[in-house]
Regions:
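Catalytic core of pol beta-like nucleotidyltransferases
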Residues: 1-17, 21, 33-39, 50-217
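Short hydrophobic/aromatic beta-strand micro-patches
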Residues: 46-48
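Short, glycine- and small/hydrophobic-rich beta-strand elements in well-ordered beta-sheets
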Residues: 21-29
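N-terminal loops that bind phosphate or other acidic moieties
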Residues: 42-44
Length: 217
């Protein structure tokens, strides 16, 4: 598995060589940030520059090509002003799931009010509902179902925050805090993540009913 501390040190060094004082923020998201990484986990980097042009995207891409584990690198690249004007419901998850390496995202906090949390839950539930119905009727894909449960686990994090005021990053800890309906979602996600067998119809029906409930909340 990647030594993420050494890897991010090298990433920051290389990024600084390429973009210098234009760097506003660098962070780590995903399983490496949560301490839940496996051999196949992505390295989910967040980079916010003063601004981003097409040339910057090309330059960043060329920089990534020089780094080890290139095939595992993913993440988010943006200009500062775009981020500060981003949809607040997206920023709720973004802020709370990002581990700072350089700089701070605290300027986003003013945008993360109760309405943003409620909207994150609503939009997430609507997207899961649509994805679930579409998959049950057309693709009938176990891989899509796994992705929908992953998305649902993020919605559960927002629900937990709404109900308790706590943002819980680690899914196993989340499982101990949330209500029974949400426990089913998180438990199923963890089972699927660890390679558990898929009961397509039952899992789809459970996810459909759960998302339906939260759309109407």
């Amino acid at each position: 598995m990647v030594d993420i501390s050494a890897w991010t040190d090298k990433f920051l060094q290389t990024l600084t060589q390429n973009f210098g004082e234009r760097i506003w923020f660098v962070g780590l998201q995903g399983s490496y940030a949560r301490g839940e990484a496996t051999e196949t986990s992505d390295i989910d980097m967040v980079v916010i520059l003063d601004e981003v042009s097409v040339l910057d995207i090309q330059k960043y891409n060329a920089m990534l090509d020089t780094l080890s584990n290139r095939e595992q690198i993913c993440g988010f690249l943006s200009g500062k002003q775009e981020l500060l004007h981003w949809e607040p419901s997206d920023l709720f998850q973004f802020y709370n799931d990002t581990k700072p390496i350089k700089g701070s995202l605290d300027e986003l906090l003013v945008l993360l009010d109760t309405a943003a949390v409620n909207r994150a839950i609503k939009i997430g539930a609507c997207n899961i509902y649509h994805g679930c119905v579409h998959n049950m009727l057309y693709e009938k894909s176990e891989e899509i179902l796994r992705g929908l449960y992953k998305s649902a686990s993020f919605v559960v994090q927002a629900i937990c925050f709404k109900q308790t005021g706590k943002y819980v990053c680690q899914q196993k800890k989340l499982l101990q805090i949330v209500e029974p309906d949400e426990q089913v979602i998180v438990h199923t996600f963890l089972e699927l993540k660890s390679g558990g067998l898929t009961n397509f119809q039952k899992m789809s029906e459970t996810l459909f009913e759960w998302s339906k409930k939260w759309i109407k909340e």
